[in-house]
Amino acid sequence: MNSKIKSIYMVGIGGSGMSGIAEILLNLGYEVHGSDIMESHIIHRLRKLGAIISIGHQAENLGDISVVVKSSAVTEDNPEIQLARQHGIPVIPRAEMLTELMRLRKGVAIAGTHGKTTTTSLTATVFDTAGFDPTVVIGGVLNAYGANARLGQGQYLIAEADESDGSFLLLLPIINVVTNIDLDHLDYYRSFEEIEHAFVTFMNNVPFYGMNVVCGDDPGVQRVLPRVNRQVITYGFESSNHIWAEIIECGIINRFKVIAHGECLGEVILTQPGKHNILNALAAIGVALEVGISPKCCIEGLANFKGVGRRFEYKGEKNGITVIDDYGHHPIEVAATLETARKVFPDRRIVVAFQPHRFSRTQALFGEFCQVLSTVDKLLLTEIYPALEKPIPGINSQNLAQGIQQISKIDVTYYPDIDAVFHALPHVLCAGDVLITLGAGTITTIGPKFLTC
């Protein structure tokens, strides 16, 4: 980055993607300021690292700043953004700053509608095992780091690429991963065709010597591959892929053989449950093999993987009740979480506390949400987490509850907020239940509160 850049201001600094970049910048010696709407453990961590952070977005927060970095959730009417533009201070999206960091390393960008965070974390773990010491920027807390970012001394930067606002097209990696392509983020994209076009552009953006590692089993990926003019390696469960898995065991622990380019590399043991995590592991193997990491290091790294925060995360037990927390907020992610829960806890009642995320997503996928949520044993449904979106008439959790009741007979109860859900837990849970707090908003807070009350 240009030596004239001294002080960086980050609007929405507490977000999962922004905070990781902030941590890397702090470790590189930059002066980092920022703001967010509320205190959090992430804010506290960044302050300890030296960041100066204000709570609330106010124009007077800006001082002598070289550049302003904005989260994708921050709109143009934000007073800090407006003042920066009035004073001619550059305002750039998060992905553009990530691109600047990527210029310092060889970039690996991991994209897809689902599975980005876990796949990025698995890839980082394999690179660590091989002694590559990568710089890593993730959208969740990698348990091995205790953080969502780390500045390494090696030549690679492994980053989660956010497709939600199209800004992932700014990145300049030499290796891309696409885990899947599904309908989402219709607050930005006007159609599924636009989403497909964005991913095609993303894959074609790698240099001529670069590589795309993509899930060959995914229908969305299959549709766009004929339009990709760069090199591609596919992975999946089908033997037609370049890299594929032969499942031995799929449950609390995943065991599978990996066949790459016709050669069996060996047996992988992965402690992350769920069939979807086998696919995530295959993506990590594909990237690792591409940069010359041995199959032995791949197998060892995956076996030592300690997981990611909020991805089917075990929180604890109380009175015979198991508490799991998961970030899933798209119907396909919810389905994967519930499928995993049924395999891990086959004879137990599954109670889900779900907080939908964004009005636009709930509207676009209303029917899909009704279908997948109707498969649980007991559903506690709270109001939609807006993520700075404005309400859409008729799109609310009460109507979602009614939609579920119209197609199933499951026990579903609506609660106006997460406090009401928390206070209801002692009355609806009993010994032997599995409580899953599910969603990308604030629902994550009620599990620990329940365990300690």
Swiss-Prot record:
Subcellular compartments: Cytoplasm
Q: What is this protein called?
A: UDP-N-acetylmuramate--L-alanine ligase
Give the catalytic activity.
Answer: UDP-N-acetyl-alpha-D-muramate + L-alanine + ATP = UDP-N-acetyl-alpha-D-muramoyl-L-alanine + ADP + phosphate + H(+)
What the entry lists under Pfam families is as follows: Mur_ligase, Mur_ligase_C, Mur_ligase_M
Q: What is its main location?
A: cytoplasm
Q: Which residues form a coiled coil?
A: none
The family line of this record is: Belongs to the MurCDEF family.
One Gene Ontology BP term is:
cell wall organization
- List the Gene Ontology MF annotations in alphabetical order: ATP binding; UDP-N-acetylmuramate-L-alanine ligase activity
Q: Which residues bind ATP?
A: 112-118
Annotated pathway: Cell wall biogenesis; peptidoglycan biosynthesis
- Does the keyword field hold GTP-binding? no
> Mind telling me which InterPro entries this protein's record contains?
Mur-like_cat_sf, Mur_ligase_C, Mur_ligase_C_dom_sf, Mur_ligase_cen, Mur_ligase_N, MurCDEF_pg_biosynth, UDP-N-AcMur_Ala_ligase_MurC
Catalytic activity, EC: 6.3.2.8
Q: Which UniProt keywords apply?
A: ATP-binding, Cell cycle, Cell division, Cell shape, Cell wall biogenesis/degradation, Cytoplasm, Ligase, Nucleotide-binding, Peptidoglycan synthesis
- Please name the gene that encodes this protein: murC
Q: Which GO terms describe its cellular component?
A: cytoplasm
- Protein's job: Cell wall formation.
Q: What class of enzyme is it?
A: ligase
